[in-house]
From Swiss-Prot:
Post-translational modification: Contains 9 disulfide bonds.
Family membership noted in the UniProt record: Belongs to the scoloptoxin-11 family.
Signal peptide boundaries: 1-16
Protein name: U-scoloptoxin(11)-Sm3a
GO CC, alphabetical: extracellular region
Tissues expressing this chain: Expressed by the venom gland.
Key words, A-Z: Disulfide bond, Secreted, Signal, Toxin
Single GO term (MF): toxin activity
Subcellular location(s) per record: Secreted
Length: 239
């Protein structure tokens, strides 16, 4: 039950802006902000947009060789809504998930997360006067394919104008499944179907993610349905 609740928390955090329209999304404020997340699963490729890239970013560059005149060098930033190659400098691939960025994150992408390092942060920024909330996702280091994000801690900061609640996640190796342990949990909502991997099946067997192969399902009050899956030789199919 505890593992199920933890997986639900992770799924909820990484889908926190699923129903937010593009024109309501915050602007990406930092180079390591994730502007979109894509996931490949049974239903195809699911896109979750998280923040809007600035149309144009300008950096002052020195002109000519005398290095006395500075002029802006501007480049247009866009957030990809389609799957990129694993080597693309504006995306980070983690197994069936890919994180998109407005600008080059090559330095972060090449740094593999250490055991105790915070790998990912979700920051909820609330404007006190209006109670308006904005959520930004920060990427700190590369989490390899057979690893997962595990909730670590929450930090809260309040000043005269804003409240910021930051949830941190570590990068942890996905363990091998024990016995009839649940290997994946999927959540289905009106416009989305997303999957979280819990453990790896033995003998290179693939944990399913088709709802028809689910071991069990739970429908929540908000209409969403959570499916639990087990490794193929232990799965009991339900209608």
């Amino acid at each position: 039950m505890i593992n199920f609740l933890l997986l639900v928390l992770i799924l909820s955090v990484l889908e926190s802006q699923e129903n937010v329209h593009t024109d309501e999304l915050p602007k990406c404020m930092f180079g390591n902000n994730v502007c979109a997340k894509l996931q490949k699963n049974f239903q195809g490729t699911y896109l979750q947009q998280l923040c809007i890239c600035e149309d144009e970013v300008c950096v002052k560059m020195l002109k000519n060789t005398n290095r006395t005149i500075a002029e802006p060098l501007c480049s247009r930033q866009t957030c990809s809504t389609s799957w990129r190659s694993d080597s693309h400098s504006k995306s980070a691939t983690q197994g069936d998930n890919q994180y998109q960025f407005c600008s080059d994150i090559r330095n972060e992408f090449t740094k593999t997360c250490t055991v105790n390092q915070n790998a990912y942060k979700e920051a909820t920024i609330t404007t006190i006067a209006t109670n308006k909330k904005e959520i930004l996702h920060h990427y700190y280091c590369y989490c390899p394919p057979e690893f997962k994000y595990v909730y670590s801690t929450t930090n809260r900061v309040v000043n005269d104008t804003h409240k910021v609640e930051s949830k941190f996640f570590k990068c942890e190796a996905i363990p091998s499944c024990n016995g009839d342990e649940v290997c994946k949990i999927a959540v289905e909502r009106t416009n989305s179907y997303t999957v979280s991997k819990h453990c790896l099946c033995y003998n290179d067997k693939i944990c399913p993610d088709d709802p028809k192969e689910a071991f069990s399902n739970k429908t929540q009050n908000d209409g969403s349905t959570y499916y639990e899956f087990k490794c193929p030789d232990l799965t009991i199919c339900i209608e």
